[in-house]
Each structure stands twice: as C-alpha cells, then as structure tokens.
Amino acid sequence: MARKRKPNFIVVLIDDLRFDELGICGHPYMKTPHIDRIGQEGAMFTAAFHPTPLCSPNRASIITGQYASRHGIIDNVARDAHSHRLPNYHAILQRLGYETAHVGKWHMGNSGMPRPGYDRWVSFPGHGSIVDPVLNIDGDERQHKGYITDLLNAHAVDFLRRERSKPFALFFAHKAVHPDAFQAADGTIDLSKGGYRPAPRHADLYKGEHFPRRPNALPSAEVVKDKPAWKEAFQLRVNEASRKVLDGIQAGTDEEIRLRAAMMASVDEGMGEVWKALEETGQLDDTFILFLGDNGYFFGEHGLGPERRFAYEEGIKSPFLVRYPAWFKPGTVADDLVTTLDIAPTLVDLAGGKAADREHMQGLSLRPLAQGRSKGSKRGGWRSSFLCEYFSENAMPWLIGMSYKAIRTRRHKYIHWTQKSLDGVACDELYDLKSDPYEMHNLIGKRTERGTVARLRKQLARLVAQSVGL
C-alpha cells in the first residue's frame, strides 16, 4: 500500500486585521469572497485570540507556539539576532521532510535577511513600503517596481506551482493592512510616511461607505470613569507628538476603515490565485489552509485608536479560518478558545512530529477539537482560559507604563495593570463577558465579585508562572 502523503500547509497572516474585517466575519460592506471560501468550505473559529496583541511578539508566538514571556520577543524593538535563534516550527518541518517558504513581512527585527528554517525567502526590511518596495529574495536585496500586495501574491503563487516531491509549508505574511511606516530600532514609529494606500485600481473602492460603531466607542472622558488606568494616556493623546501620529492615518475615521477595506481587495484577489494554483495542481484537498490576523485593532472602542496592544476584545480577537477536509466539514463554526500558540503544535502534529518536537511549545494541537467534532463529543479537556500579556514600549507617545497581565475565560476577563495605580489603589478591571460583551462595566470594586476576582487572580498567577520557564 502506498504511504499517504503528508499534508501541505499554508498560513496566511494579515497585519492589523480585526476580527470583524472580513465579509464572512460580518463586515458591513467589505467583499472578500476568496477569503470567505476558506471558512465556508472549512471552519470558522469565533473565539480565536492573540496572547500578546502586537506584531512582533505575536508573530514569534505563531512560529514558536510560545508565550512572549518565554520566546523573548516582547515588543517591536528590533531584536534581529534573537529572531535567528527562535525555535521556529518551520525548522522542525524541514527535518520532517518539508519544503518551506516565508513570503512577506517578518518584523521580528528590522533586517530583511533570510532566517533559519526556510528553503525559500521573500521578505523586506522592517515594515516595508507599499509601493516599489525593497524585497529580499533569498538574500538578494533590491528595489522592485509595483504594489507590494501584488508582488507578494505573485511570489506565493509561484512557490505553490513549483514541481516538487516533498510536501510544502508556506508562511504568507502580507504587509496589508498596515499603513506605510518607519519603525526605528528602539521601537518608535513614524506613521507620516504615506498612510494607507490601496492599489490604484481600488483607490475609490467603497467610497462613501459607513462602518457602524460598536456601543463601546466612547469618548475618553466616559472611558476613564470605568477604566482609570487610561487617565494619563488620554491626557497625553492631546499633545503635539500624539496628534501628529493620530492625524497622519486619520485614526478612527470612516476613511481609515474604508482604506483598510480597499487594501484587502488585493489580498482577496491573491487568495483567488492561491485557490486556482491549488486546484490546477491537484493539491487543494491535501492542503491545510489557515487565515488570520497578527493582532486586533481599535476603531474608537474604549476611546482607543490606532492602538492594538490591549486586552479588550477588539485588540485580542482574531479572524481564524481553517480549511482541511480531513478535519473539518464545510460550514463548521467553532467557539472553542483557541490562540495563535496553537498553530505551531497543530502543524507539527499533522506533519507527523513526535511529542519531543512539541515539548517546548505552550499551545495545543487542534486535532482533539477536530476529532471531537467528528465524533459528536463535547470540549472536555480543552483549555478554559488563557493568558494575555503586554510589555509596555515606546512606539506611541501616549502609551506610558501600560504593561498588563490578563486572563480571559469563557465567561470573564480580568486585567491586571502591573504599572498603574490611582491613589495607591490598583487600576485593575473585571468584566462579565456574558452580560457585558462590550466590556463597558468594570466590576472590580463590586462586593459581589470578590470571589470571582480572587479565583481569577489565582488562575492568572498560575498562567504567568507557566508562561515563563520550562
């Protein structure tokens, strides 16, 4: 009997994409038919989250299966040397017989040079440029003409169409929908370099459309009544340095939201070419496809924007679409708590890796969820909570001392601000997500919630301890 071929893997990562910025996820006007097809023919996970909702740390968590506390990429400071030493799942896949490729944004360090674990490398320095970008192709770095999303789409499809005897693993990380920006080695960012830029053919797409705001899109004066940790940050947002950043990308406006949607049109076109390549080469049903964002984003919720770093649902929740017919029936909708830590162990598991290949990983393989669904069983044994953490950095001039550790369960969220207090009293937050899904009513001081707070603090302490060391 012929030995069954190992599955191929495609992970498509979008920069700054919110959980609701796809057609299938409820966007009121964005059309993403090719992306939506992943969830329509597979599974849509409606409770998928980022343990550290920030570009560099979360990307490192995706490829290592580890919390930022363990892998060490804790912010957007340029840790180029460290990023070469990460226990990247692609290196494990190479040992298991895979041909691997990274196409797109790396951003664990500002260098665009190839990292270990990849047979094919197409990337760019730092955030890159939307138009006529410098690309590093297998170590050859030079400027290329064109729109960056189109260029990356072409490189990804070229890799998929190559003849090979091995299974492949493609990590496809778009620059979209991040605006043009320059990030210094210390993590400070300049957003005055051109802002959001759709492809010229999509420049007027969705003109005049309106994105309805969520009930928690409140002015800062209202927010601080319930969330005192934000008092200093909101005061700093009105200074000249802060306004320069905010005004440069039209933060929180309908135009910002429209431009992001228009940028996604090129991403969706590329996904259409991916489908075509897989179908024409006969690889579609043997390929595990995952589509997600690298962190959330705020459109004015809790007075925030253009932040992504924070533990409210808009910041930590991700679209998470999976197509793999051997595991998920078309139209599956799953509400299990999954995180980006689960990607590396899932792919290594599917590739035939042993327990030793995953022993350094803190995420979980999705296999039990897939098998449980096929057998009609409940989610027994799956996680009931996860840690969310952020290490304050200096990217935005108003975000001073905003580090936190948080726990999110199926019912509650508890946020411990590690550097914030008001008159000597902690500024922590507690939300009952069942009765308050928009996190508008901080219950931390309620006498009736003392037991809940004590229990969550104990669970959080255990998660923090587990996150740090082996």
Q: Residue ranges of each PLM-predicted region?
A:
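Formylglycine-dependent sulfatase
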Residues: 1-429, 437-470
